[in-house]
Structure formats: structure tokens, C-alpha cells
């Protein structure tokens, strides 16, 4: 049975991932990660950069190109997505850094607030390989996706796909994440 969680490996090269990590580590606009409407490090302990694809940076282009190929494959496997109305890549996305012991262990879905109801599919790119946990757990499907550099994961945003980060006590974790959403 299709759980609608798709994993695509080697979508970004290690060099591309390292380039994005360097951007995260040197960006002056990094701030504590928001969860819902505020910061609560007991539920989500991260450092985030809020980016826009319209900035046309090398980071934007690398991520956009990687996602384009994955979405084509995702839609082939899930053709019903073409019949639900017009939707596309949301302009905003997040680059996130989790320190050892940090993470997002709070189970959540990506359309849990009325302000997020337009979201259709979430995307996440692992930018580094984490060998001490560090993946993403989907408890309803008894599935954990491992954090492997260059790996893209796509899944539905709704309550049917609650997930949470698996905290690494010893290693950093870097991801890029965002959404495909209905467009008016």
C-alpha cells in the first residue's frame, strides 16, 4: 500500500550539500527556529534561515533544480495530484541547523494551523549524513527516513502524516525544507 512518502537519493551532490551548509554556517540572518507561532526549544530546538526562491542565489537554484526532478517522479507515482487544483512550489523555505542534542522531536504535521491549510506536499532535503539517529520518524507508518546527504523526501502535509525528528545526541544535522501549496 502506498504511504505517499517518497525518498530520492543522490539528488544533490556532496559538494552542493557542503556549499549549502557553508551558507548556513556563515549567514548572519540565522535565528532560533519557530514552531507554529513561536519559539519553544523543548519541542523544536533549531537554528533557521528563512529564504525565498526569488532571491536567485546559488543555494536557491540548487534546491529548486533538485526539487523539480523529484516532483516529476512523485507526480508519476501519485497522478491524482494533477486533479486537485493549481498548486506549486511555495516561494519561502527554511534552511535549518540542529546542534547535537537539538532537533524537532515533537510530533507534528505541516498543515496543523489554518494559516497552513494551503499546503499540499512537504519537501525536505538532508544536507549531511547523520549516523547517530538524526532521521525523520513517521510513527503511523512505522517508518524512519535516515539523514543521508543529498536525499530528498516528499510527503503529504496533512494530519495523516504526523512525523518528528529523531534527535542525534552527538552530531549536527542540516536540512532544507518547504512546501508545495495551492496557488490562488
Question: Residues of each region from the PLM?
Answer:
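Fe(II)/2-oxoglutarate oxygenase catalytic core
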Residues: 1-152, 160-184
